[in-house]
């Protein structure tokens, strides 16, 4: 039996032996849906790190650059559809094997695939909120507002980047008009957790509560370089739970894993979860 088949057989056994899985997914789970990831096989940045919270809140130039790239990128991101990995994990949940699926992604593709008990750890890109009055709204109308205010930018074409961004280089972002909150005139931000921003406590508590009842942990498409997700794997290891990972390249928790399959998530899960 070759190593590939051996890994798949071992993963089938791992999943078959669990009744209360805690699943943690990252960007690699959505790459087959056409959404790029941030890191290479060594866990290093493939491109410039994303904007951080302080920069976004601290100045109009940073917000103009962010929203220009996001407006152009949303056309691609908003059309992404679940891939075989999302559908396989949804099947596991529908069978009652998944206590909670915690995703670091903001694309809502697990829900689109029919996933149950999904926790969007870092929020969701299909909603926006005001940082002053907490007004909230769907991304569709906000996208329309952005495009009406910036018709010349709306016609631009650019390559897709992670998390709904677009690769726009050499542009004069000072000419991009950033709309304000329709209720109070405040700063509008996507309802996602930026770098430098804290994950809401209730989400973290819900994840830890599910982990206490889990009998195994499955990591899908995450290098675990971000502490926001890595901490749950650390806690699982301390509790003696078996941990498996499907990920191309190294993870921060390689020394904690009972099993690792270094192949694309969609291919592996399509074969293992019938």
UniProtKB/Swiss-Prot annotation:
Keywords: Cytoplasm, Metal-binding, NAD, Transferase, Zinc. Belongs to the sirtuin family. Class II subfamily. NCBIfam families: PRK05333.1 (NF003738). InterPro entries: DHS-like_NAD/FAD-binding_dom, NAD-dep_sirtuin_deacylases, Sirtuin, Sirtuin_cat_small_dom_sf, Sirtuin_class_II, Ssirtuin_cat_dom. Residues 1-274 form the Deacetylase sirtuin-type domain. Zn(2+) binds at residues 130, 133, 181, 184. It comes from the Bacteria. Its main location: cytoplasm. Pfam families: SIR2 (PF02146). It is found in: Cytoplasm. NAD-dependent protein deacetylase which modulates the activities of several enzymes which are inactive in their acetylated form. GO terms for cellular component: cytoplasm. Its cofactor is Zn(2+). The keyword Metal-binding applies. It catalyses: N(6)-acetyl-L-lysyl-[protein] + NAD(+) + H2O = 2''-O-acetyl-ADP-D-ribose + nicotinamide + L-lysyl-[protein]. GO terms for molecular function: histone deacetylase activity, NAD-dependent; NAD+ binding; zinc ion binding. This is NAD-dependent protein deacetylase. NAD(+) binds at residues 26-46, 104-107, 221-223, 247-249, 265. The gene is cobB. The keyword Transferase applies. Its EC number is 2.3.1.286. Binds 1 zinc ion per subunit. The active site is at 122 (proton acceptor). HAMAP family: Sirtuin_ClassII. It comes from Bordetella bronchiseptica (strain ATCC BAA-588 / NCTC 13252 / RB50).
